[in-house]
Amino acid sequence: MALWGGRFTQAADQRFKQFNDSLRFDYRLAEQDIVGSVAWSKALVTVGVLTAEEQAQLEEALNVLLEDVRARPQQILESDAEDIHSWVEGKLIDKVGQLGKKLHTGRSRNDQVATDLKLWCKDTVSELLTANRQLQSALVETAQNNQDAVMPGYTHLQRAQPVTFAHWCLAYVEMLARDESRLQDALKRLDVSPLGCGALAGTAYEIDREQLAGWLGFASATRNSLDSVSDRDHVLELLSAAAIGMVHLSRFAEDLIFFNTGEAGFVELSDRVTSGSSLMPQKKNPDALELIRGKCGRVQGALTGMMMTLKGLPLAYNKDMQEDKEGLFDALDTWLDCLHMAALVLDGIQVKRPRCQEAAQQGYANATELADYLVAKGVPFREAHHIVGEAVVEAIRQGKPLEELPLTELQKFSPVIGEDVYPILSLQSCLDKRAAKGGVSPQQVARAIAFARARLG
């Protein structure tokens, strides 16, 4: 049953109906639509449209429908209703007859769908926050267990300075904490109710919209009806948070894909998150991580697509806004799935400490320590930098790490170098010296783990 048929003398072309109908995706708003309808029925009592008895009958029928939807959501897609609002209203009329036709008094699908979508977003943000914090906790736990796993840190994908696997884990904890903060900030702006704004100019019934917002769990009601029914910047904000969050997960995946290669060999992934080859029996492919990396693109696409949809729309509601849902649903589903999968990857990961240590020792990652040593002996840093560069060239020529060059060799580059240089060139010394806040020293890493544990609870 269409909600708008009185104006028309011809039925819609079936091809147009298929093009126009949105039930195939907005069915996901069924629970929110029913919850919003219960609240609206209460508001109609306050303005005399419904009696208390009528409202109770409607609420009971809506609650039965809600339980039915939760038990068998696929039933919605068996309908030829235009959208979820039409479906809910049709089912309600089936249950209570003519009384069901009174529920839409003073309400438009414009404020109705805006409310449904915000309620869905609030529910989904709660799920995302939980999954985000679970991944943070998994990273902190992995860091706790790998504080002594020394490995090379990289710039330009070249070995740069020694770090620990724990410090690497904590870098992603910081990124995820910012993602969490972005979601919490978005939730504050999302937490306002558009219900009662009608099609665009507000409702003609003197409904207490603040009370109505409270019944729905919103912090307050929106302040402008035109903005309320045409606002989708909360969708953009969540898509932006998802796009940034997926970039972080993509980088996390790329790092571990590299660490897992035969060339690096720093970690081994669990059989539970890898797959094999149909041809090559020896293969163990990091499919979970590659899919996380690959799915990043579709989330960026959803954000860009929504930006382009909204950029030229006049106030207030336009049918273009029907395009707000599929990209949003897919992007947030994808982000949620990837958060869960990243945590699963960490659950069975094995860090190969000897190989990590070997790689850290091979990459001349202690070259900066030698430069700092020379500075402490009074050599200007720029000169020290040049001296150490020459020493590294010689070490490479001989196929040795810096710390294995004899003192006589090192003194050819600078006479100020003494026996006291060798303890400074050890990997442990390199770590210990990075003791300022945020550094890789064991003390700072332990503090960072303790701080993260306390924050996550």
Curated annotation (Swiss-Prot):
InterPro entries: Arg_succ_lyase_C, Argininosuccinate_lyase, Fumarase/histidase_N, Fumarate_lyase_CS, Fumarate_lyase_fam, Fumarate_lyase_N, L-Aspartase-like
E.C. designation(s): 4.3.2.1
Domain of life: Bacteria
GO MF terms held by the record: argininosuccinate lyase activity
Pfam family, one: ASL_C2
Keywords: Amino-acid biosynthesis, Arginine biosynthesis, Cytoplasm, Lyase
Top EC class for this record: lyase
Catalytic reactions on record: 2-(N(omega)-L-arginino)succinate = fumarate + L-arginine
GO terms for cellular component: cytosol
Lyase in keyword set: yes
Disulfide bonds: none
Keyword Lipid metabolism: no
Coarse class of the protein's main subcellular location: cytoplasm
Pathway(s): Amino-acid biosynthesis; L-arginine biosynthesis; L-arginine from L-ornithine and carbamoyl phosphate: step 3/3
Compartments, as annotated in UniProt: Cytoplasm
Biological process annotations from GO: arginine biosynthetic process via ornithine; L-arginine biosynthetic process
Family to which this protein belongs: Belongs to the lyase 1 family. Argininosuccinate lyase subfamily.
NCBIfam families associated with the record: argH, PRK12308.1
Protein name: Argininosuccinate lyase
Lineage per the UniProt record: Bacteria, Pseudomonadati, Pseudomonadota, Gammaproteobacteria, Enterobacterales
